């Protein structure tokens, strides 16, 4: 085997939140994800009944999943890991649902979560996320100072809009994002601008932001390929959220088709991965003497 990319779809992103139309049934959502060619899904593991139903479907169709959780303390990770032991998962995606003011207050939490993951033999990735321990870029960089080997899931949309990087993004800010990406073992996909956390990749006026994120994701993939084992799997979760993440017009309708945007993102990232893999293959291919 060789290193592989697996593109997943967020089930949260399948929510429509329309006032005059019902939500898609769960089985419809899962069938859409399968038929669209995704490799799996992001699954909330805080609800055992929900997680069991979803993973049963995904497993029956040869798909994978990440186990998502939102612990407020160390012990809240334990039932998630117990459920992972029963149902399996590629990894646990942990959103630390705490907002310490002091970096020192994070130490026992990070140490505890990592210890539990190691004891269970499960990879635990800490997500960079709004309104969590990792909500601020500089605070998260300080975490990396304390835990240089901390495994992150990179959702960098929050950092672009949170710090409102000047445009074009300068090398200093690129360097800060690159440091996050150098610790990332998974990616959550959403394209932001410096003022909006989620924009459609299809609008002409957004192409500069699309290119920015494709460049960051290229850096992330190349960094991961250097660090990961020869048979490792990188997951990329398409996570285009429903309103109010998605921008709506005066009629309450979204300005773009978010499902179609996710399909476009899936194909863009797979093409990016293939280009990088092809380039790496040419660089490592043995030279034939003439």
Located regions from the model:
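Short, low-complexity, polybasic intrinsically disordered segments
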Residues: 247-280
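Active-site acidic/histidine proton-transfer and metal-coordination neighborhood
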Residues: 64-152
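Flexible glycine/acidic-rich beta-alpha junction loops that bind and position SAM and/or redox cofactors
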Residues: 10, 16-17, 161-164, 191-205, ...
């Amino acid at each position: 085997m060789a290193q592989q990319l697996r593109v997943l779809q967020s089930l949260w992103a399948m929510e429509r939140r329309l006032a005059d139309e019902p939500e898609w049934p769960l089985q419809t959502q899962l069938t859409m994800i399968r038929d669209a060619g995704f490799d799996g899904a992001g699954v909330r593991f805080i609800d055992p009944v929900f997680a069991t139903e979803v993973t049963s479907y995904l497993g029956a169709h040869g798909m994978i999943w990440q186990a998502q959780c939102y612990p407020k303390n160390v012990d809240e990770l334990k039932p998630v890991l117990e459920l992972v032991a029963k149902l399996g998962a590629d990894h646990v995606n942990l959103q630390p649902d705490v907002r310490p003011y002091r970096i020192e207050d994070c130490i026992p939490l990070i140490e505890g979560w990592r210890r539990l993951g190691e004891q269970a033999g499960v990879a635990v990735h800490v997500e960079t996320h709004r309104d969590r321990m990792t909500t601020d870029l500089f605070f998260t960089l300080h975490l990396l100072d304390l835990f240089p080997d901390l495994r992150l899931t990179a959702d960098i949309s929050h950092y672009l809009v949170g710090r409102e990087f000047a445009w074009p993004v300068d090398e200093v800010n690129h360097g800060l994002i690159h440091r996050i990406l150098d610790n990332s073992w998974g990616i959550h996909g959403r394209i932001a601008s410096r003022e909006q956390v989620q924009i459609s990749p299809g609008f002409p006026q957004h192409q500069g932001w699309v290119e920015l994120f494709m460049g960051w994701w290229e850096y992330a993939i190349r960094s991961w390929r250097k660090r990961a084992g020869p048979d490792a799997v990188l997951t990329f979760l398409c996570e285009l959220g429903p309103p109010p993440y998605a921008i709506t017009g005066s009629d309450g309708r979204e300005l773009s088709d978010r499902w179609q945007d996710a399909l476009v993102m899936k194909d863009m990232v797979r093409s990016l991965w293939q280009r990088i893999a092809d380039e790496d293959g040419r660089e490592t291919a043995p030279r034939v003497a003439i």
